[in-house]
Amino acid sequence: YPVKPENPGEDAPTEELAKYYTALRHYINLITRQRY
């Protein structure tokens, strides 16, 4: 099962947040694809 990306926190640099949200979207896609 895919591991949920770590939240970098409010004061993380923009690149880190962008990377996190991309990983999170990918993670959600993986989970929903497996479920349905």
Curated annotation (Swiss-Prot):
One of its GO terms (cellular component) is extracellular space. Its main location: secreted. Keywords: Amidation, Neuropeptide, Secreted. Pfam families: Hormone_3. It comes from the Eukaryota. Belongs to the NPY family. NPY is implicated in the control of feeding and in secretion of gonadotrophin-release hormone. This is Neuropeptide Y. It comes from Oncorhynchus mykiss. The lineage of its organism: Eukaryota, Metazoa, Chordata, Craniata, Vertebrata. The gene is npy.
